[in-house]
């Protein structure tokens, strides 16, 4: 669970609180899975990615606000922690909060990944703010600081699921999606 939150900070292209996932857990007595994939929003329709002729429009399902689902990562990771974990939420999230707040030296692979999506990030102000350096490309070795993410992780640390799915974080997500 701690690694899932740490990946949100250090490897956002593979792990993040805006998406979903699944987990296999092995205890002394059994093996189980948790599916916390993102879900389609309530306003979704079966034809939302089709044009007037009924042809599939892949770009609509892959890029932009219509392609987003309701995130499941926070609920799934916290469920795993509550049901199978041995640490407190605060302890599990502490290092991820520190990494996001203080930053870390960006490795070459992360810089390359972010820069490979540079044009796409620049189309969306909220993505540009996080995943570019003031609209410029990142360079390996630069400090990658994510204060807003640190604040969100703090809310999750203190309030659990409600720190993400209710309150200011949820309001900001809804506001962004409605624009």
Specify the residue positions occupied by each region the protein language model found.
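Noncatalytic scaffold domains of N-terminal-nucleophile
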Residues: 2-179
């Amino acid at each position: 669970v701690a690694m899932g939150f740490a990946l949100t900070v250090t490897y956002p292209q593979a792990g993040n609180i805006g998406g979903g996932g699944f987990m296999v857990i092995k205890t002394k007595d059994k093996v189980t899975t948790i599916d916390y994939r993102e879900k389609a929003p309530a306003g979704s329709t079966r034809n939302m990615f089709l044009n007037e002729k009924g042809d599939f429009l892949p770009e609509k399902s892959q890029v932009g606000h219509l392609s987003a689902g309701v995130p499941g990562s926070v609920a799934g990771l916290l469920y795993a922690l509550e049901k199978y974990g041995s640490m407190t939420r605060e302890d599990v999230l502490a290092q991820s909060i520190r990494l996001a707040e203080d930053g870390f030296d960006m490795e070459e692979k992360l810089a390359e990944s972010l820069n490979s999506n540079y044009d796409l990030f620049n189309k969306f102000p909220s993505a540009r703010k996080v995943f570019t350096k003031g609209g410029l490309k990142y360079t390996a070795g630069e400090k990658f600081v994510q204060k807003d993410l640190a604040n969100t992780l703090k809310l999750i640390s203190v309030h659990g699921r409600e720190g993400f799915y209710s309150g200011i974080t949820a309001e900001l997500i809804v506001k962004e999606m409605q624009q």
